[in-house]
Amino acid sequence: MITGLLKKIFGSRNERLIKQYRRKVAQINALEPKFEALSDAELQAKTEEFRQRFAKGETLDALLPEAFAVCREASKRVMKMRHFDVQLIGGMVLHDGKIAEMRTGEGKTLTATLAVYLNAISGQGVHVVTVNDYLAQRDAEWMGRLYNWLGLSVGVNLTTMDHDQKQAAYASDITYGTNNEFGFDYLRDNMVYDAGQRVQRPLNYAIVDEVDSILIDEARTPLIISGQAEDHTDLYRRMNGIPAQLTRQIGEEKSDGTGVEKPGDYYVDEKSHQVYLTESGHEKAEQILLQAGLIGEGESLYAPQNITLMHHLYAALRAHSLFFRDQHYVVQNGEVVIVDEFTGRLMSGRRWSDGLHQAVEAKEGVQIQQENQTLATITFQNYFRMYNKLSGMTGTADTEAYEFQEIYGLETVVIPTNRPPQRKDLQDQIYKTSKERYDAVIRDIRDCYERGQPVLVGTTSIENSELLSNLLNQAKLPHQVLNAKQHEREAEIIAQAGRPKMITIATNMAGRGTDIVLGGNVEKQSGFVMADESLSDAEKASRVKTLQDEWQSLHEQVKAAGGLHIVGTERHESRRIDNQLRGRAGRQGDPGSSRFYLSLDDQLLRIFAGDRVRAIMDRLKMPEGEPIEAGIVTRSIESAQRKVEGRNFDIRKQLLQYDDVSNDQRKELYKLRNEILEAQDVGDLVKNLRESVFTELFRTYVPAETMEEQWDVAGLEKTLREDWGVDQPLVKTLEAAQSIEDEDLLKIVLDAAEAVYEGKVAQVGRESFAGFERSVMLQSLDTHWREHLAALDMLRQGIHLRGYAQKDPKQEYKRESFELFGRLLDTIRNEVTRIVFTVRIQSQEELEQASEQIEEDLSALTNLQYKHDEFSELAEVAAGDAEIHGATPAMAASRSAASAAAAALAGEVPKVGRNDPCPCGSGKKYKQCHGKLV
């Protein structure tokens, strides 16, 4: 109540921000006459003037009013479009590193040009991130005319580009590209073996289009670069037959023993997207595997040697119980292709991880492709947080504003519409069965068709879109289908979806980024005419005029019929996706309407609200075909959606807390890798490694603070000679000396090792040997980093079970992953030193051969695959952790711990004192915990 009163007096935070921005809009508008009076050349010269002023210390904030005014004037001259005042506000929101929520049709693409132009003045690069290559190329070409006219270079970063083209794209002032490609380029840059092979500059500023889709919908799923691992294809085929021999349990057993409607061997938890074997299921599975000869007599499925079988069995069960053809994937040209859950688009080249994709291939009887080993991985959350400044645009961000603020530190500002919205959102209609629901949908579509009103029908899967298409064919209603199978015609179908009597079926929000204009998209048709070289200029002008007149007539006709009508055939688990569908109607003050038709068979209702709604229908004795249309039911559904959204947010937050641990380690390792790449001479780094290894070896035989009688000098001498090629008579030295300190003996060992090293360098020359050392270090880093990623995956898979032992899984994961990281650095340190000391090189030719061999080993990893998985193992762990523990505070000290360990590898002194608390958070002293590792 008090909050509401304060809002009435002072306005909401959003209203206050808009008020501040409107003051700046007034400044920009005041400059308009001045810039209108400039010639083209004078206006174009402003860009260089701004750059010089920025170089002399003037801030971008100070340049904003003039830069926005210049960009607006240039747009009027080049694009024939003038930025509205609300678009100026949107541009300022983007420049301030916030998220601008702008309704569909309000001109987000043009709005972005303001912030892009201003930030490109710095010369440090601006990345405009889109959801697919088509939009990246379209916007780069479309808005590139404006930027080029203003003297800025524009590049587009596409999947198909080669290395040189990518370098040129990133060197441009402005680079358009997809979120996947930017992320993969970052990972690839950290796999190169020559600094000149990197394509990206330091990450300066990014504007993310459809920011909700990229930073929220896809945030649970990491980008992965992988190479082929061991072949298990036969095992997948054999496991594929097992689910059919097991029976599914209906209902989940509760703590009081109730809840099971029909006993079985496994049950499916649709909420957590998991399959679990029951006790009887374990026994039955063991019998089946025993008969198949996959496990031995008396062996348990949980025996260490059978963990792989468990992994494959669960993959097969999930493939059969949770993933369905034409809903989660399609089979195309003998391959299983994933369907994007949120857009309905086909995701060619992407594969589910952890053996799930191979299990689905076995189920469908297509060729099973080999499993992959992860070479590099990063989540979008951690990639985009590396930019100095990040902002985004979308039509639907307000429902996720808390998550944007919590995870990314991004505030959401709702931008006012240029004209008041006219769309009518009608009450949901809920039917008992799917048949009744589809009958009502067909009636609604027929009514619109007869009145000449265009209809956009949203479905949640390809299967549903094709079912509806068949029903419309039976009803003799002409229509077009837009789903993943028609991806190529997407923009064309959407562009004409606003013509009279047009019926368009779209899977989820396929077609985002293209406006549905009432009467059809005349610009698209005019473009075809202008591109026709057989026509004269006069004929082109005449035909374009005819098209525009025809469009104006159709536009008025559609407006009179009520504008675009949106029909939703099912509620999505996220309100935001539903709002995106609704948002296609009523653009820029046009009329429009929307209604959702639901049935009690829908997944969301079945899981969260079905029993309550069914009870209401039974109590009201609703006749067949009669819907419920009441606010209380709609609110009940929205409450269910909020529950799902809250749970998904918890999963994403948990995922980030887990991934932050490996991210800190990744950043430290990549930082070290880049130092090796860029160093003129890696000699100092190798020397630090060398001294660390020999000191550790020395302390194995001569422990600190011990008596001379406790030293094993003979063993040390033998190990140095046989394992390291360092022949130093330590026993004689000790006998000849009356008394010697351990530190003096250590100095003798280090000097002897240094002499052996210098002898090797002298044989081939310092410069050549430094190149060899660089190759050895990079190979060792990359090989063991890959193994470390696999080890982290294994650790993650079972860590949530620690919750049952009253331990915090995240704290345990942080502690154990840091121990693994310490071992990784220890292994690298020892391996690099051992190779450098034991390699036998007599000449320059032999050194070149050794370097070439390393290069061959590195280039063997050419068969790389790039994946952005639909739902990763890491997300499942986070989900499991959320079930057991709930959300707990983030793991705070992992970065300092990883930094300390990496610093030790580089030979730097850790900042943590030996008696200080260990950064891992265990509560122990550093020397008694991770200090041992460094």
UniProtKB/Swiss-Prot annotation:
Catalytically driven reaction(s): ATP + H2O + cellular proteinSide 1 = ADP + phosphate + cellular proteinSide 2
Any one Gene Ontology molecular-function term assigned to this protein's record: protein-exporting ATPase activity
Membrane-related topology note: Peripheral membrane protein
Cofactor: Zn(2+)
Compartments it resides in: Cell inner membrane; Cytoplasm
Residues the entry annotates as binding ATP: Q87, G105, E106, G107, K108, T109, D515
Listed GO CC annotations: cell envelope Sec protein transport complex; cytosol; plasma membrane
InterPro entries: Helicase_ATP-bd, Helicase_C-like, P-loop_NTPase, SEC_C_motif, SecA, SecA_CS, SecA_DEAD, SecA_motor_DEAD
One of the GO BP terms on file: intracellular protein transmembrane transport
Class of enzymatic activity (EC top level): translocase
Keyword terms, alphabetized: ATP-binding, Cell inner membrane, Cell membrane, Cytoplasm, Membrane, Metal-binding, Nucleotide-binding, Protein transport, Translocase, Translocation, Transport, Zinc
Main location: membrane
Residues the record lists as binding Zn(2+): C918, C920, C929, H930
EC number from the UniProt entry: 7.4.2.8
Pfam families, alphabetized: P-loop_SecA, SEC-C, SecA_DEAD, SecA_PP_bind, SecA_SW
Cofactor note: May bind 1 zinc ion per subunit.
Highest taxon listed in the record's lineage: Bacteria
Subunit structure: Monomer and homodimer. Part of the essential Sec protein translocation apparatus which comprises SecA, SecYEG and auxiliary proteins SecDF-YajC and YidC.
Family: Belongs to the SecA family.
Protein role: Part of the Sec protein translocase complex. Interacts with the SecYEG preprotein conducting channel. Has a central role in coupling the hydrolysis of ATP to the transfer of proteins into and across the cell membrane, serving both as a receptor for the preprotein-SecB complex and as an ATP-driven molecular motor driving the stepwise translocation of polypeptide chains across the membrane.
Protein name: Protein translocase subunit SecA
Phylogenetic lineage: Bacteria, Pseudomonadati, Pseudomonadota, Betaproteobacteria, Burkholderiales
